[in-house]
Amino acid sequence: MKQAIHPEYKKVTATCSCGATFEFGSTAREDFYVDVCSQCHPFYTGKQKQATTGGRVERFNKRFGAAIKRN
């Protein structure tokens, strides 16, 4: 195997806007910041707000449902 052709593998720290830090190995870059992580993302915390806007079928029935029922 050739020597000294592989990139340097170093520890990198990702810091979230909520203050959580994660350390892992990488060859790509140095420390960086992220907007959301598993500790503050609404999907993972269970505080997810769901906007029930209805699907395509409900939208169709809202527009044409009365016309179909008359026939």
Swiss-Prot record:
Q: Name one GO biological process term.
A: translation
Please list the cofactors this protein needs: Zn(2+)
Provide the residue positions that the database annotates as binding Zn(2+). C16, C18, C37, C40
Any Pfam family matching the protein: Ribosomal_L31
Q: Name one GO molecular function term.
A: rRNA binding
Record GO cellular component, one term? ribosome
Q: Does the keyword Calcium apply?
A: no
Q: How is the cofactor bound?
A: Binds 1 zinc ion per subunit.
Record key words, sorted:
Metal-binding, Ribonucleoprotein, Ribosomal protein, RNA-binding, rRNA-binding, Zinc
The UniProt similarity line reads: Belongs to the bacterial ribosomal protein bL31 family. Type A subfamily.
**HAMAP family given in the database record:** Ribosomal_bL31_1
Provide the function of this protein.
Binds the 23S rRNA.
Assembly with partners or alone: Part of the 50S ribosomal subunit.
* Entry protein name: Large ribosomal subunit protein bL31
Organism of this sequence: Chromohalobacter salexigens (strain ATCC BAA-138 / DSM 3043 / CIP 106854 / NCIMB 13768 / 1H11)
